[in-house]
């Protein structure tokens, strides 16, 4: 990803990046085909309206501009709304649910539960921490998929209301809490050292700030939340969302991150999220 402040800076960064990639590929006996090289703009609606596409056309005429691109199974769009990703995900999950519904009578409840988790829930949980801060309508679309999966497991009508008691029976968290659950687990991995370095450096405890002074916040396991100016591209970033969600957890849950096993922390975190959730089904 290339971040530039102005047009001239963008041109030089693109040229340097292409030259670096080409040199690396040449050293590994590969060749960069610029005719198949594509790029994707990221920014707010105002920033995208001000973009100068002629700059890239002048620097690399063969570059093809995209409105969305797939990366590690996730469809990224220019404004990071993930609308296309959720649409594709909904299509895939509902297709799997329809297939499972046709063979439901031939499966045991345990087998059906396993298949729903394998073909539906795993798809919804994959990369869902990147969905933090998306529009409420996007979260509702994902929640509808969970509702349909719950109706299939409990063998109720597709028009039946999914009450809080049913969710307690399945012990499933709502989509919004599932996103917070995965993000908090990622922060925990950063604190114990099992996450990559580029993520660990984003989760800085208060005790290790520039003043190096021990405070009450450091005893409670509080992390530093950077200041940001933008809502979509600032607060949604892991450097802000991760520490912010972590600081909202109770002190006893945060302390389990480094003092207990991953399983014990996940149980405590899930219990807390269940106690705090507001059910609107």
Give the location of each predicted region.
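Amphipathic alpha-helical
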Residues: 60, 197-243
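Short, conserved catalytic/metal-binding micro-motifs enriched in Asp/Glu and His
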Residues: 1, 25, 69-79, 93, ...
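Structural motif
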Residues: 66, 106-118, 170-180, 228-233
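Catalytic palm subdomain of template-directed nucleic-acid polymerases
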Residues: 1-23, 133
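Hydrophobic packing residues in well-ordered alpha-helices of helical domains and bundles
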Residues: 11-14, 18, 32, 86, ...
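Basic, alpha-helical interaction scaffolds
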Residues: 62-130
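Short, charged alpha-helical motifs in flexible N/C-terminal segments and linkers
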Residues: 22-40, 138, 143-207
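Short, conserved micro-motifs composed of acidic
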Residues: 16, 23, 30-68
């Amino acid at each position: 990803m290339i971040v530039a402040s102005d047009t001239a800076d963008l041109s030089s960064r693109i040229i340097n990046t292409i030259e670096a990639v080409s040199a690396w590929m040449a050293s590994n006996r590969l060749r960069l085909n610029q005719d198949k090289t594509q790029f994707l703009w990221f920014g707010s609606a105002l920033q995208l309206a001000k973009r100068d596409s002629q700059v890239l056309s002048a620097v690399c005429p063969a570059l093809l501009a995209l409105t969305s691109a797939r990366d590690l199974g996730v469809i990224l769009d220019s404004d990071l709304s993930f609308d296309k990703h959720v649409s594709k995900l909904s299509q895939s999950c509902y297709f799997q649910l329809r297939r499972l519904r046709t063979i439901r009578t031939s499966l045991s409840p345990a087998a059906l539960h396993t298949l729903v988790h394998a073909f539906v829930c795993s798809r919804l949980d994959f990369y869902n921490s990147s969905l933090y801060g998306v529009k409420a309508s996007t979260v509702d679309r994902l929640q509808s998929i969970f509702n349909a999966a719950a109706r299939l497991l409990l063998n109720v009508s597709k028009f039946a209301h999914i009450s809080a008691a049913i969710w307690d029976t399945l012990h499933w968290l709502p989509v919004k809490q599932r996103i917070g659950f995965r993000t908090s687990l990622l922060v925990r991995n950063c604190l114990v050292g099992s996450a990559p370095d580029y993520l660990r450096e984003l989760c800085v405890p208060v005790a290790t700030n520039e003043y190096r002074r021990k405070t009450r916040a450091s005893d409670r396991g509080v992390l530093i939340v950077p200041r940001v100016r933008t809502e979509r591209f600032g607060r949604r970033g892991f450097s802000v969302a991760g520490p912010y969600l972590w600081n909202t957890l109770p002190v006893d849950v945060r302390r389990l991150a480094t003092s207990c096993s991953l399983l014990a922390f996940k149980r405590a975190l899930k219990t807390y999220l269940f106690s705090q959730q507001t059910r609107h089904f």
